[in-house]
Amino acid sequence: MTVQSKLQGRGKFKKRFFRAGQQVPRPTLELSSVWLSKIFYNPEQHHNKQKMIESGITTRMSGIHENPGQSHHTSAQDYRLLTTDPSQLKDELPGDLQSLSWLTSVDVPRLQQIGGGRPDFTSSAQSSLLERQTAQLNSMTVAGGAGSAIHLQSEMQHSPLAINSMPQFSPGFPCAASVYQTAPQQVLTFTQANQQCSPGGLYGNYNSQNLFPQPRITAHSQDLQPKCFPKPIYSYSCLIAMALKNSKTGSLPVSEIYSFMKEHFPYFKTAPDGWKNSVRHNLSLNKCFEKVENKMSGSSRKGCLWALNPAKIDKMEEEMQKWKRKDLPAIRRSMANPDELDKLITDRPESCRQKSVDPGMTRLPSCPPGQTLPLAAQMQPQPVVTLSLQCLPMHQHLQLQLQNQSRLAPSSPAPAQTPPLHTVPDMTNSSLPQHPAKQHTDFYTVHTDVNSEVDALDPSIMDFAWQGNLWEEMKDDSFNLEALGTLSNSPLRLSDCDLDTSSVTPVSSAGGLPYPDLQVTGLYSSYSAIDALSNQYMNTQGGTKPIVLL
């Protein structure tokens, strides 16, 4: 190739790679060195470099040259890279290629290695060596019977940079002692069981083994994860009522309501604290709950107690049963112990349990002195009340039994539309006989403000019993229904009514015995009969006359 053709090729290279305002791209070391060695080859320099190589590293490279099946010819590229004087390349290079003189910098470390007596191998020699060793490992098979041993010999070879190279397994691969230093042999013994395998198969089987069975790991991880409980479908008012119903006293502080909800519904253990505000709001605003006095407020226990409104207990139980019928599986999933659901709904504290009452009898609750009891609000739509009053101790021989039969008719007018009272004869000026051995005293005193010996509203003296149809009995007894007095809700005094005294025969000349005030609200009353002992003093001609009690 002539110089002109070389220059033409250089011109193409210049047009292709050189651009205005750009630096020369740096090609790889291998391509640049080959390209330069082909263009600038000088036989004289080749002869000088060959002498230097023979004197320096020929003996050390003999191990590679003597390998069978491998020929190593020193190329111009190797000699070019071993140039010791970078100025020679600079002088030989044309002016337009002097910028490529940085390629000669690779000679400095190589010359230092040669001077220090440490051999270096080219990348091509190392790659060919590794390829042969890999092929030998893959082609080698190890055969053995039961109890036979396989001896694998490995030699540790040191590279120029003190890095261990791969072990040699083939005895037919010679290695010069001057280049490689053999380390002590390591004998590895493996016991095989009637199988043929390669070293790659051995390592592959080992790597594919699992130290722990996968199902066991999965089960263990599932045990560590806590069970997730959904939010209960019950409203906060139902949950609060459930907590109060299952308490010993029927009342709890707010903190114990929280504890009950977290114990039976674990969702609230990890839920945000906003649910506690909802509980407090329900306690304050819902009429089903009422605040009660804390009897232990003087001790270390502080805060108020909350209890169920007794009138709302049945309503709350109905609400719980409704949600239970609506979605029972969802409720059971949200509970820590689903078997306790029925117990939580139906149980009541002792203070809230209804006392068993005779189906034929009911008792009127007591009323504080000086107050009237609204009987009309406590009675069923059609009750018949029999009032039995005991006599005072000073009138033990005179038994006066007042049986007042009344009925709250469904068609009765409202208190604001109550018609005026029927007037009856006045008996305030009449006198009743008294026992000969007794001094004159008041005949009957029921007013609670005056006499504390008799409590007209005490259940021990007032007994209310359910009777049959009042109107049929009145017809049989020839009662005059039109004469029944109709009362308003305001208390009525007997002293305000006029009673007929023409049929009453006074026995003594003592002063009249006035009736005291008897207060009862909202009853239709009639005087039906008197005791047999009083027949000698009072004549009941023409049937009984209705009088108004209260």
From Swiss-Prot:
InterPro entries: Fork_head_dom, FOXN1_4, TF_fork_head_CS_2, WH-like_DNA-bd_sf, WH_DNA-bd_sf. GO terms for molecular function: chromatin binding; cis-regulatory region sequence-specific DNA binding; DNA-binding transcription factor activity; DNA-binding transcription factor activity, RNA polymerase II-specific; sequence-specific DNA binding. Keywords: Developmental protein, DNA-binding, Neurogenesis, Nucleus, Transcription, Transcription regulation. It is found in: Nucleus. Transcription factor essential for neural and some non-neural tissues development. Binds to an 11-bp consensus sequence containing the invariant tetranucleotide 5'-ACGC-3'. During development of the central nervous system, required to specify the amacrine and horizontal cell fates from multipotent retinal progenitors while suppressing the alternative photoreceptor cell fates. Drives commitment of p2 progenitors to the V2b interneuron fates during spinal cord neurogenesis. In development of non-neural tissues, plays an essential role in the specification of the atrioventricular canal. Its main location: nucleus. SMART domains: FH. PANTHER family: FORKHEAD BOX PROTEIN N1 (PTHR46721), FORKHEAD BOX PROTEIN N4 (PTHR46721:SF2). Residues 402-437 are annotated as: Disordered. It comes from Danio rerio. Residues 231-327 bind DNA. Disruption phenotype: At 36-48 hpf, mutants exhibit pericardial edema due to dysmorphic hearts that fail to loop and form and atrioventricular (AV) canal. Hearts show continues peristatic pumping rather than coordinated and sequential beating of atrial and ventricular chambers. Endocardial cells remain squamous and AV myocardial cell shape fail to occur. This is Forkhead box protein N4. Residues 402-411 have a biased composition (Low complexity). The keyword Amino-acid biosynthesis does not apply. Isoform 1 is expressed mainly in adult thymus. Isoform 2 is detected in adult skin. Isoform 3 is expressed in adult brain and embryo. Prominent expression sites include the olfactory placode, the basal layer of the olfactory epithelium, the neuroepithelium of the developing retina, the germinal zone of the differentiated eye, regions of motoneuron development in the neural tube and periventricular regions of the brain. GO terms for biological process: amacrine cell differentiation; atrioventricular canal development; heart looping; heart valve development; positive regulation of DNA-templated transcription; positive regulation of transcription by RNA polymerase II; regulation of DNA-templated transcription; regulation of heart contraction. Pfam families: Forkhead (PF00250). One of its GO terms (cellular component) is nucleus. It comes from the Eukaryota.
